[in-house]
Amino acid sequence: MQDQQLLRYGRHILLDDIGVEGQDKLLASRVLVVGAGGLGSPVCLYLACAGVGEIRVADDDTVELSNLQRQIMHGTDQLGELKVMSAKDAMWRVNPETRVVPLPERLAGDALLEQVKAVDAVIDCCDNFQTRHAINRACVQTATPLISG
């Protein structure tokens, strides 16, 4: 771990349950976040701040004015922009070392399965039951840990 990383993640490293080994695991981890709205916004930002190595964020929606009071990752400057691109910019601002992969689509079927296979964990921040069920099925099929918000 580099000196700058030791400074950035020092508070994590001090925790007995994390330490240097745990932080190294976070830096090497890959997470898929489905949904970049009200729940996905803080999730993405905290994952980036924690030092997750790669965050794939999937959402097919654009930033609207009505989103701004609850979707903290987006701002007035991003109105009309794809949420995943706004998310990428926001995560880069808090941690430029995190690799962000924007997926501007509603994941389903084989595309969802391929994304789930490519990560260590999935965080479901979507807003509809059909997608939640599909995510759950893909995670069960691939034995990928799932956190549902």
Regions from the PLM with identified roles:
Residues 1-149:
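Adenine nucleotide-associated cytosolic modules
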